[in-house]
């Protein structure tokens, strides 16, 4: 079974053509991916779990909700799992809208096997980063208000002495709060902490 550091990778297949789903299922399972197939978008949306490591392989033209509608609904829910469009439509407007909303690829049926697998490998990498960000964001939620205050200044490069002055507490207290917060976040040093928070764009959450 294909795995990454974040665990098993599942490709969610959404297409109203059963033959297409069968072909994709066979191909992707043969190379080691898990798959879950849907002939309509709504059941996928109803049971969607953003904590699952995976990507969505999505048709554009379907009865009811189309692929762009599904993408917009996921965006509305704040779910940024990678999306790859696989469609017969080569609409420039649809392509632009899909990429503007965060799609990582827009493939035209019948896509070459190598092209499809390359897009999914890119999705594996992207979603590993997403889940890492998700995990660290959950750790941020465990910080105390004081730890958040201290870290918000640490990641901006403010010295312990100046943080102590700004917060009206002793420098020793700054060191203790910084050490506790770094342990909670899993950061080995300040440089790693800064990289982590910048990548996650969580400085505003720490403020």
Feature annotation, model-predicted:
Residues 39-40, 66-69:
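Acidic catalytic/metal-coordinating carboxylates
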Residues 51-57:
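Active-site beta3 strand of CheY-like receiver
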Residues 59, 87:
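Active-site residues of response regulator receiver
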Residues 62:
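Receiver (REC) domain active-site loop signature in two-component systems and cognate sites
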Residues 68-79:
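Short amphipathic alpha-helix used as the core "switch/output" element in two-component signaling
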Residues 91-93, 111-120, 162, 166:
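C-terminal output helix
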Residues 179-207:
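Basic, Lys/Arg-enriched C-terminal extension of HTH/homeodomain DNA-binding domains
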């Amino acid at each position: 079974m294909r795995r990454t550091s974040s665990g098993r990778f599942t490709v969610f297949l959404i297409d109203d053509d059963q033959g297409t789903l069968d072909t994709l299922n066979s191909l992707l399972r043969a190379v080691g991916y898990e798959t879950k197939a849907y002939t309509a978008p709504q059941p996928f949306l109803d049971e969607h779990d953003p904590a699952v490591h995976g990507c969505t392989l999505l048709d554009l033209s379907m009865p009811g909700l189309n692929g762009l509608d599904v993408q917009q609904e996921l965006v509305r829910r704040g779910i940024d799992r990678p999306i790859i469009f696989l469609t017969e439509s080569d609409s420039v407007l649809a392509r632009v809208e899909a990429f503007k909303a965060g799609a990582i690829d827009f493939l035209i049926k019948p896509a070459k096997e190598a092209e499809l697998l390359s897009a999914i490998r890119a999705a594996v990498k992207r979603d590993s980063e997403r889940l890492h960000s998700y995990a660290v964001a959950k750790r941020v939620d465990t910080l105390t208000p004081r730890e958040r205050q201290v870290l918000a200044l640490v990641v901006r490069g403010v010295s312990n002495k100046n943080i102590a002055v700004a917060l009206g507490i002793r420098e020793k207290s700054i060191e203790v709060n910084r050490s506790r917060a770094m342990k909670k976040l899993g950061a080995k040093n300040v440089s790693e902490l800064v990289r982590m928070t910048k990548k996650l764009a969580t400085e505003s959450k720490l403020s």
